[in-house]
Amino acid sequence: MLTLGPLNLMIDNYMGKHSFGQWLFAVRPWSFPASAMPIIVTLAYLFWTGADMNWAFGVWTLVNMVLFHVAGNVWSDYHDFRKSVDREDTTGATTLTTGMFQPHEIRNLAIGVFVVAAAGGISLVLLTGLPLLWIGLAGAVLTLLYPLLKYNALGDLDILLTFAFLPTIGTAFVTTGVIDWSVLYIALPVGLITDGILHSNNTRDMVPDKRAEIRTLAMGLGAKASAIMYSFEVLFPFVWVVVCVIMKVMPWPVLVALVAFPIALGCSLTMLKSPREGADIILDLDQRTAKLQMVFSLLLSIAFVISRLVF
């Protein structure tokens, strides 16, 4: 009888060195709205349009996107530690700087999760068609190259593509079988807030990033301009939603997303004060922005579903 005893022993020996809570901490679950929400909003939007959807493929895409996000998170942490972007005195990821994990553990975790996500993506390609292959390849390459792009002021563009435009277009194709460019109407506002998560992080870390001799977009702009850019990223999505309702490309119930505006305004005001009061006041702004992303996107999603069922 075939057993998986040796494999199970290997997994236990590797995983058993750390608690489940430590592994969970390593993958930064608070950031998952950045990957999950674009898929959820896209599914809700397509439901509102009356598209003939494969919901099983939609859920599969959601899980796969989060797995790619996990791989990207720990892959970035590994490279940030190797390049001394993250140190004991920095406020970034602490899984390596505190000695909780060894570099090879984080590297292997990134590779392992990436392989699982890639296998899931290839399976979806076989079930849906070649267009998904090119979308998936672009996303995979951008995920792997993210550290390099981030160090050369292109991280924000990478995130906008990887966590907004590509997943929304890909989700539309996977669930309906066609490329639906109208999903870009929802990709932009959701993607801008996602970019705000990264931008708040990079604005906070400008001093240690300069010491590590990397160049982020926030560093190029400077503290004041970075604060203005962040404010645009979290506030403009609300303007966009209103304009889309006026243009009748979104149903009027999506205006309920404006309920999240006070959260966005609070985040913006905090960032705008940071050039005067210092980076300490934005230590948790990336997490606050992720919460904004979740609230804004869930409200949009609920509105699309209600619009289809009720109005």
Residue ranges of each PLM-predicted region?
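Topogenic membrane-insertion module of multi-pass membrane proteins
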Residues: L2-W60, N152-D158
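Small-residue-rich segments of transmembrane alpha-helices in multi-pass membrane proteins
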Residues: P33, M37-V41, T95, D158-F173, ...
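Membrane-embedded alpha-helical segments that form the functional core of polytopic membrane enzymes
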Residues: I39-V41, G50-W75, L133-A140, L144, ...
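Acidic (Asp/Glu-rich) catalytic motifs at the cytosolic membrane interface
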Residues: L67-T90, G196-A218
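Functional transmembrane core segments of multi-pass inner-membrane proteins
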Residues: I159-A212, K224-I228
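Extended hydrophobic alpha-helices typical of membrane-associated regions
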Residues: I246-S307
